[in-house]
A protein has these predicted regions:
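Alpha-helical recognition segments enriched in aromatics with Gly/Pro capping
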Residues: 1-64, 167
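Small-residue-rich helix-loop
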Residues: 69-167
């Protein structure tokens, strides 16, 4: 189990995958822990042998990442980072929590969220020489103003970002 968790599989998603190996309940694919307990019945166990399907594990994990409450997802992410990555500065945790809605969009694993969050986690963003030429004084001011307003947000959403951009 540790190897799956190490690559960023959420324990609840792995439990769901293991539950579905050889067992089914109607057309339902995703089960909460309580549903698993309430609905499991030996009559739903099939006779066919089961085989490991990593794509299916990633698919179930992605579903969990996309549908789980963002605070709960952040807690899974924080636990994952503390165990397998470097500690995150406390000041960045709030930004990560606010950004979880965006960070999870293209993620299938907690590792993907880690990779997607590097621009938040790392203090410095590398800007290439060609790109630096494109940033004039007005652009710097716009970026600083945006960053200042972004820090004040209590929750990150499309609407809140649009509001900052339009102001």
């Amino acid at each position: 189990l540790e190897d799956y968790i190490k690559i960023g599989i959420i324990s609840d998603a792995l439990r769901n995958y293991l539950l579905r190996l050889g067992w089914s309940y109607k057309d339902k694919e995703i089960f909460t822990k309580q549903e698993s307990i309430d609905l499991f019945d030996l009559s739903g166990v099939g006779k066919s042998p089961s085989k490991l399907d990593m794509n299916r594990i990633f698919s179930i994990n992605e579903t969990y990442i996309k549908t789980i409450d963002e605070k709960d997802l952040f807690n899974f992410f924080k636990e994952y980072v503390l165990k397998y990555k470097k500690p995150i500065d406390q000041t960045k945790e709030n930004v990560l929590l606010k950004s979880m809605g965006f960070l999870k969009n293209k993620a299938k694993t907690l590792e993907d969220i880690w990779n997607n969050a590097q621009y938040i986690i790392n203090d410095k963003v590398e800007i290439g020489a060609d790109d630096k030429k494109l940033i004039d004084d007005l652009s710097r001011k716009v970026i600083k103003d945006f960053a200042s307003e972004y820090e004040k947000l209590s929750a990150l959403s499309r609407e809140s970002l649009e509001s900052i951009i339009k102001s």
